[in-house]
């Protein structure tokens, strides 16, 4: 039950694929092992919540929480502080190679101090030790080898174990907030000026240095970013004040990618949707090669490809952002070309006839549906488990 197959996948956006760090190994255990890990993850989550081991602003690898909750909490906080006339800055950091550096003995010590059941701790230590893996790629030897790393990627319980492992990195800031999603940490601070925010954020990596050294983890330098939030009506000079961390200069970014959401200093939705449009076009250029006129996939399978990969890529983020009129026209123009390929019609076909033939939902309707679908779980979630729900005004009816 500890033998697994490792699927080697390349990480997108890497400059050089000649180094091992440019690839990711997804581990596939036997079905019974996956089921046991999933059940243990549910049991550990329940125990951790009852014992208070999870930070209230942790949104990763927990049932009922997702990327939307983390980003919604972040945007709500800095908009609330901006309404109080504060300047808000945020530092984004990523734990480098976090899953590989988890020490089972230190993890067991953390869980023991938290009061977790000794039987569950013993099961976790057994799960992390003496695992064997066989890599799957062309020309690979079909032999199993012992894996001497922390937690395996692809395991249902690995992200949850990592969340407990780095829980000590959540610090309490007097005028700030720390939000995390597994290995992504977001540190926000507010003050009367941007330089004051820089002075408050700059010591954070140094404060956590001894904790990170004890846990054998470090922050990734290329993924460290800074942003100074602004309101659309702010007429003051744009601040380009950088932050210095470990003798390295990090200037503020004009667009930051957080959990698939593209954030700008003024939270303009066009940047996010134009990035999603570029990804959808790249996917469509690959998919359309599978089917051309009179050959390839059938029309029914073409429709499956449109509603399967393309629309989710194009509309990701509609639960938080609403596209403006100009961006919506660009999205509809791209969708028109996709539907023309799906129905094998001319590009100049009247839109009304094309939409009746292809029968897709309009982009604007999809955005509204995604927005409502995200709001419903938000108001139904317990506020002590969901940080975004905890920030809903008392006048709004919620589960509580």
Task: Say what each PLM segment does.
Residues 6, 24, 36, 40, ...:
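Mobile genetic element proteins and their domesticated derivatives, centered on retroelements
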Residues 247-321:
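Basic, alpha-helical interaction scaffolds
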Residues 3-6, 24, 57-61, 88-98, ...:
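Catalytic palm active-site di-aspartate
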Residues 1-152, 189-190:
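Conserved pre-catalytic core of RNA-dependent polymerases
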Residues 242-245, 326-400:
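RNase H-like, metal-dependent ribonuclease domains
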Residues 42-44, 70-80, 195-216:
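Inter-domain linker/hinge segments that demarcate the starts of reverse transcriptase
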Residues 139-140, 217-254:
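Short, conserved micro-motifs composed of acidic
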Residues 97-115, 174, 185-210, 231-234, ...:
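Catalytic palm subdomain of template-directed nucleic-acid polymerases
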